[in-house]
């Protein structure tokens, strides 16, 4: 838990002194409270987000699907037969494409899905100061769809790109950026507003075939993060 308080002076414009406490250390800075739609608590995180934004114009909140990516509620179940495969909260089964009215453009593509709920106790750190963010991360093949239990992060023409995105979402870098906006257990496209879009083709400046730890280090270098910022993540 914790306590956050402020004094509001309604007729004053300008910067506000902000003091944060992390692991017994206090940091102070002058902040513009209206600079962003969301207020980032830790000053270290502000610097990281600023570096990411200075190197990217497009973020994953423009790619992640809305709730109900295929228009199917959580309680929808597979049919006895169908030309599609439906992923729902208890597994997979047949479904008919004639019943799909939303997300048709994604059906034939390779899709990466996540649960619309974060991992248990999201927002709370463990003894090492780490947070669990994504509770489910799967790939749907062409002709596979899902209920609103899941969000489609992105859809691709090739399996190579989908696998690269899957690796990207496993990095500490991405999960840290999601955590800054994931204050509740519900995930939505808005929570990906700090996650920079990447090139997942073979022409990418990141080698997605490497280990997750190595991909993390490539991303840290790409966005010019310092040793202290990497340690904070």
Show where each model-derived region lies.
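Short, amphipathic C-terminal "tail helix"
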Residues: 228-233
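C-terminal substrate-recognition regions of SAM-dependent nucleic acid methyltransferases
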Residues: 2-149, 154-206, 210-227
């Amino acid at each position: 838990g914790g306590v956050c308080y402020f004094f509001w002076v309604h007729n004053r414009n300008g910067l506000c002194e902000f003091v944060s406490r992390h692991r017994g250390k206090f940091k102070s800075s002058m902040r513009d409270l209206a600079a962003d739609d969301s207020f980032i608590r830790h000053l270290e995180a502000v610097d990281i987000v600023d570096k990411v934004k200075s190197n990217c114009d497009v973020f994953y909140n423009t790619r992640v699907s809305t709730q109900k990516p295929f228009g199917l509620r959580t309680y929808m179940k597979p049919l006895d037969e169908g030309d599609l495969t439906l992923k729902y909260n208890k597994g997979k089964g047949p479904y008919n494409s004639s019943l799909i009215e939303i997300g048709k453009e994604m059906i034939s593509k390779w899709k990466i899905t996540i649960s619309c709920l974060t991992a248990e106790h999201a927002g709370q750190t463990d003894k090492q100061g780490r947070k669990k963010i994504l509770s489910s991360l799967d790939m749907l093949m062409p002709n596979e769809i899902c209920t609103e239990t899941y969000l489609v992060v992105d859809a691709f023409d090739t399996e190579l790109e989908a696998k690269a995105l899957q690796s990207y979402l496993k990095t500490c870098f991405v999960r840290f950026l999601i955590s800054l906006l994931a204050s509740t257990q519900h995930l939505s496209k808005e929570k990906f507003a700090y996650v920079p879009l990447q090139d997942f083709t073979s022409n990418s400046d990141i080698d997605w075939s490497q280990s997750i730890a190595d991909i993390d280090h490539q991303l840290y270098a790409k966005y010019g993060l310092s040793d202290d910022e990497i340690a904070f993540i």
